[in-house]
């Protein structure tokens, strides 16, 4: 069992139960999945660069990424139907908890001028943010990076409100800016 999963079952559930006064243990929020996505439209013109970014995403997530393709052609953007324009990975289970543990303890402290993530969720129990650079992940070989590429990370929970979601993620180790 992952360290973070064990922490959730032994401590975090009790903390959330006490704070939000749930009547049933099934109401306690759970982290369902983590979605990591990269928009690679500019890299789509260069197959080697596109493939390099796919490999970096695979190394970061420990899972093969799914290539997202254009639904229809747009001449103004030089985009053809079926052309690869991005990649995404959905993490669940043990890989999800391992990624969350690595992200909170190793990656987020490596972000330049990091003072915490914004305290704004989507209102439905999910939390998303963007990273400007993939080079903050220790798994990425800096000598092989051809171009800096950002990514979006979405934490999907079963929480009903932003307060529940942010409390769950904060208990799991994600750092947020303090309210002023």
Curated annotation (Swiss-Prot):
Gene3D superfamilies: 3.30.1440.10. SUPFAM superfamilies: RL5-like. The keyword Amino-acid biosynthesis does not apply. GO terms for biological process: translation. GO terms for molecular function: RNA binding; rRNA binding; structural constituent of ribosome; tRNA binding. It comes from the Bacteria. The keyword ATP-binding does not apply. Part of the 50S ribosomal subunit; part of the 5S rRNA/L5/L18/L25 subcomplex. Contacts the 5S rRNA and the P site tRNA. Forms a bridge to the 30S subunit in the 70S ribosome. This is one of the proteins that bind and probably mediate the attachment of the 5S RNA into the large ribosomal subunit, where it forms part of the central protuberance. In the 70S ribosome it contacts protein S13 of the 30S subunit (bridge B1b), connecting the 2 subunits; this bridge is implicated in subunit movement. Contacts the P site tRNA; the 5S rRNA and some of its associated proteins might help stabilize positioning of ribosome-bound tRNAs. This is Large ribosomal subunit protein uL5. The lineage of its organism: Bacteria, Pseudomonadati, Chlamydiota, Chlamydiia, Chlamydiales.
């Amino acid at each position: 069992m992952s360290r973070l999963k064990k922490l959730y079952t032994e401590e975090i559930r009790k903390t959330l139960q006490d704070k939000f006064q749930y009547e049933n243990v099934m109401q306690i929020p759970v982290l369902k999945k983590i979605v990591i996505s990269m928009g690679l439209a500019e890299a789509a013109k260069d197959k080697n660069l596109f493939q390099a970014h796919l490999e970096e995403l695979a190394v970061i997530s420990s899972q093969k990424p799914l290539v997202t393709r254009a639904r229809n052609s747009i001449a103004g953007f030089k985009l053809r139907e079926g052309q690869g324009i991005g990649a995404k990975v959905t993490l669940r289970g043990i890989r999800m908890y391992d990624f969350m543990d690595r992200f909170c303890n190793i990656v987020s402290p490596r972000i330049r001028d990091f003072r915490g993530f914004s305290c704004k969720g989507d209102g439905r129990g999910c939390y998303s943010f963007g990273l400007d650079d993939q080079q903050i992940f220790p798994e990425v070989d800096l000598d092989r990076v051809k171009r800096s590429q950002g990514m979006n990370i979405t934490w999907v929970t079963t929480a009903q409100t932003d307060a529940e979601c942010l409390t769950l993620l904060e208990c799991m180790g994600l750092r947020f800016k303090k309210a002023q």
